[in-house]
């Protein structure tokens, strides 16, 4: 069964509500599509936000989230339960985003469009986006999860599989780098 047909099957099934994460996980392992719908309802918006801030546009973010749920569907039996299912989905989503960003960078290296000056009202956002692209991807992810998603360092550490202290240090470094990049003089 192809990924598209698996997702189409999931979209057509009736939805059910599962009271606990354990029940939901058991239903997902039985491939009950209503369980995957509940996973999407519970975590889809957060994953879309993370993906959007990682890849930079809605279409790619939607592709990354779709890929996330497809990988979760295929790999649910490998989920050990060492973390919350939402944490596991975030990890899959971040990896899907990184894969997509790498793919887009390779495509962009082949074709370079002409630069167009940003509209005045978009200048600050464009400067921030450019600065975010220039910092280390790991620090950028910590910054986005903390500043945009409002996650705690303990959640970030679990998702990124790093110590909590590393999350705090990377956030500090990301803020310092962004401040430097946004205030540096351009020739």
Predicted regions and their residues:
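Sigma70-family region 2
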Residues: 29-30, 56-58, 67-85, 103-106
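Short, charged helix-capping/linker segments at alpha-helix termini
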Residues: 11-15, 29-38, 48-67, 164, ...
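Short, aromatic/basic-enriched loop-to-helix "N-cap" motif that marks the start
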Residues: 75-91, 164, 169
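Hydrophobic-face residues of short alpha-helical interaction/recognition segments
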Residues: 47, 51, 76, 89, ...
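A short pre-motif secondary-structure segment
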Residues: 142-146
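Short, basic/polar amphipathic helix motif occurring as a linker/hinge flanking DNA-binding modules
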Residues: 90, 100-123
């Amino acid at each position: 069964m192809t990924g598209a047909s698996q997702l189409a099957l999931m979209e057509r099934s009736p939805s059910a509500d599962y009271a606990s994460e354990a029940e939901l996980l058991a239903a997902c392992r039985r491939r009950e599509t209503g369980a995957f719908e509940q996973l999407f309802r519970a975590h889809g918006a957060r994953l879309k936000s993370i993906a959007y801030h990682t890849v930079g546009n809605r279409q790619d973010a939607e592709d990354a989230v779709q890929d996330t749920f497809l990988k979760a569907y295929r790999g649910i039996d490998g989920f050990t339960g060492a973390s919350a299912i939402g944490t596991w989905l975030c990890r899959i989503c971040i990896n899907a985003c990184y894969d997509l960003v790498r793919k887009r960078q390779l495509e962009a290296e082949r074709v370079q469009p002409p630069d167009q000056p940003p509209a005045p009202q978009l200048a600050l956002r464009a400067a921030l986006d450019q600065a975010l692209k220039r910092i280390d991807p790991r620090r950028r992810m910590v910054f986005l999860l903390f500043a945009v998603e409002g996650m705690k360092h303990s959640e970030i550490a679990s998702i990124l599989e790093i110590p909590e202290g590393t999350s705090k240090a990377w956030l500090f470094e990301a803020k310092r780098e962004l401040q430097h990049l946004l205030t540096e003089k351009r020739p």
